[in-house]
Amino acid sequence: MIQFTKMHGLGNDFMVVDGVTQNVFFSPEQIRRLADRNFGIGFDQLLLVEPPYDPDLDFHYRIFNADGSEVEQCGNGARCFARFVRNKGLTNKNKIRVSTSSGKMTLRLERDGTVTVNMGVPILEPSLIPFKAKKPEKTYLLQTAQQTFLCGAASMGNPHCVLDVEDVASAAVAEIGALLTKHERFPRGVNVGFMQVINSGHIKLRVYERGAAETLACGTGACAAVVVGQIQGKLDQQVRVDLPGGTLTINWEGEGKPLWMTGPAQHVYDGQIQL
């Protein structure tokens, strides 16, 4: 039997598994079955906690989408990860250093129950996003058979394309998201953000995630939207980001600096399952 915990960050939900005290392995087929909301546990992503690969770090963790694919980064998952390792007694620290397949980051448990995550320095160089473009630009033209889109592009360890929309509530997120997430100019696929700027310190955002469709919240998507908005001269250093599942606060001092994301992480229940 495998012990697991169900958690969510603003409705972006996770199955979190302790791979430090348990010997666990998940095949893509098992992950897809567990992710099924009718026949399994149901989640957007599975988070697997592992011992650190580096003695200077506290943990390593792996992130799997509901379709079984492994991904590089997840902001909402990082907050749940921090709350999980503390709740399970795997650490007694309030400041936790971890690695994922995309790099290292620092997580800080706040007194009010929220978690602040150092999301790292955003990647704007197209070849590293990866995105097919000759040089970094504030905006890019993305052409499809149906229409042309104006977008910003950045990576937070995973690739993001951000579109500016007048009304996020009526945006065709499912249709446009499905169209752009596999666009040929993003060789590894892309998460697609739909950003409505309310004012320079406040945006509304919906995100169509690569491998998971639209989710209630996307932490890396919120960071990417703030980066793109700042670069385009629309946003301040600290921005409130309203997502369908709730609110995040993103702080970015500008190019070459890391982003800091603060938001909630909720425990739902503990369970055990036979694979």
Curated annotation (Swiss-Prot):
The keyword Hydrolase does not apply. This is Diaminopimelate epimerase. It is found in: Cytoplasm. The active site is at residues 74, 218. Its EC number is 5.1.1.7. Signal peptide: none annotated. One of its GO terms (cellular component) is cytosol. It catalyses: (2S,6S)-2,6-diaminopimelate = meso-2,6-diaminopimelate. Gene3D superfamilies: Diaminopimelate Epimerase, Chain A, domain 1 (3.10.310.10). GO terms for molecular function: diaminopimelate epimerase activity. Its main location: cytoplasm. It comes from Shewanella sp. (strain W3-18-1). Pathway: Amino-acid biosynthesis; L-lysine biosynthesis via DAP pathway; DL-2,6-diaminopimelate from LL-2,6-diaminopimelate: step 1/1. Catalyzes the stereoinversion of LL-2,6-diaminopimelate (L,L-DAP) to meso-diaminopimelate (meso-DAP), a precursor of L-lysine and an essential component of the bacterial peptidoglycan. Disulfide bonds: none annotated. Substrate binds at residues 12, 45, 65, 75-76, 158, 191, 209-210, 219-220. The keyword tRNA-binding does not apply. Belongs to the diaminopimelate epimerase family. The lineage of its organism: Bacteria, Pseudomonadati, Pseudomonadota, Gammaproteobacteria, Alteromonadales. Keywords: Amino-acid biosynthesis, Cytoplasm, Isomerase, Lysine biosynthesis. Homodimer. The record marks 160, 209 as: Could be important to modulate the pK values of the two catalytic cysteine residues. The record marks 269 as: Important for dimerization. Pfam families: DAP_epimerase.
